[in-house]
A protein has these predicted regions:
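Catalytic cores of alpha/beta
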Residues: 117-118, 182-199
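Radical SAM enzyme [4Fe-4S]-AdoMet core and its adjacent flexible, acidic
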Residues: 52-55, 61-81, 144-146, 150-152, ...
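Conserved SAM/AdoMet-binding glycine-rich loop
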Residues: 23-175, 179-183
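Conserved, mostly hydrophobic/aromatic
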Residues: 21, 133, 207, 269
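A generic structural motif
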Residues: 175, 204-212, 276-279
Length: 331
């Protein structure tokens, strides 16, 4: 609902022929600066190369319906045979060392293909260390407004991706695209996403804040405050500071965001997530924060009396959090 590619290029998928791709790939091998690496074969969504179903060719695209969200259509045909054939043929050309897929792929479409040949060869031959995918959020309510599949699809894809990666003894990761402040996303939803990222050891280096673009359903929600499909009211964070709070939660681990994260948690009274416990999102940023909030707790008062020597000092003890994934990269 938020992507404007369909307005730029149309909803109907058009593809180059295998012959055209092979001719261009062969030409590359004769260029003096070519090193043997083709960095991408695929469109905006690499694994879309055919009509969604037989009905689409006969009757055209469905109005007001989506092929994959909120659930895959029963008429959807998920097949990667042609795309896989092209990739295999290009790999076999003399002078070609590697063929990567750097365009994003629709993992929800990939999961609908009962033949796992493409999935396995994708992992084995076409990932240059990390693969881009776009779960965008974890909240079902927000994903429904986005027109994206629920997070269970991403979890299943991730599980199989790392399973296949382990079977070939490779070190490869996922780079998830994430979005803050999409219409329908509340501060509670942003906190749920932060907790999901923490639980799954995901530390995104870049996140996208929702920006309204002309013509999209999401922009309609943003400006009207209504879901055009249901006419129900939709909350949108529009104040720059409110948007900053949601964005900071997606990178809760970044020191420059600590103050914003603490403010967001206090705003909706999630004091349980402020502290030194491993399940917390941020350590207290306000001096004597814990003592002030726990002043009625007799056990804490006793501990304070027993720690006279440390009076005036904040105890931020605890295990250092691991930065999971390859250095300077994340999954």
């Amino acid at each position: 609902n938020f992507c404007s590619i369909a307005f730029h290029q149309g909803r109907y998928i058009t593809t180059r022929s295998k012959k055209s791709i092979m001719i261009e790939a062969e030409k590359l091998t004769h260029m003096p600066n070519f090193k043997g690496y083709i960095h991408d074969i695929g469109g905006p969504t690499a694994n879309f190369r055919q009509p969604s179903c037989m009905l689409q060719e006969e009757h055209g695209l469905c109005k007001g319906k989506k092929c994959l969200a909120p659930k895959p259509c029963k008429n959807l045909v998920a097949n990667h045979e042609e795309y896989l054939d092209i990739l295999r043929s290009v790999r076999q050309l003399p002078g070609i060392k590697k063929v990567f897929i750097r365009s994003g792929i629709r993992y929800d479409y990939l999961l609908q293909d009962k033949d796992d040949s493409f999935f396995r060869e994708l992992v084995k031959y076409h990932v240059s260390g990390q693969l881009k995918v776009a779960p965008e959020h974890c909240s079902a309510a927000v994903l429904d407004k986005m027109g994206k599949p629920h997070i269970e699809a991403y979890i299943e894809f991730s599980k199989r991706y790392f399973q296949y990666t382990g079977e070939i003894d490779k070190e490869q990761y996922l780079v998830p695209y994430l979005m803050s402040s999409h219409p329908g996303s509340t501060l509670n939803d942003a906190i749920d996403l932060a907790l999901f990222l923490k639980k799954n050891h995901i530390r995104p280096e870049q996140v996208q804040d929702f920006y309204p673009t002309p013509g999209t359903i999401s922009t309609t929600m943003f400006y009207t405050g209504l879901d055009p499909y249901t006419m129900e009211e939709v909350y949108s964070a529009k104040n720059p500071h409110d948007k900053a709070l949601q964005r900071a939660l997606l990178q809760y681990y970044n020191p420059k965001n600590f103050a914003l994260v603490e403010e967001a948690l206090k705003k909706i009274k999630r004091f349980d997530l402020i502290g030194t416990d491993p399940n917390c999102l941020v350590r207290p940023q306000t001096p004597n924060y814990q003592n002030r909030n726990n002043s009625g707790n007799s056990r804490n008062n006793k501990n304070n009396r027993n720690n006279k020597n440390s009076r005036g000092k904040q105890n931020f003890g605890g295990k250092k959090q691991n930065n999971y994934g390859r250095k300077k990269k994340n999954r």
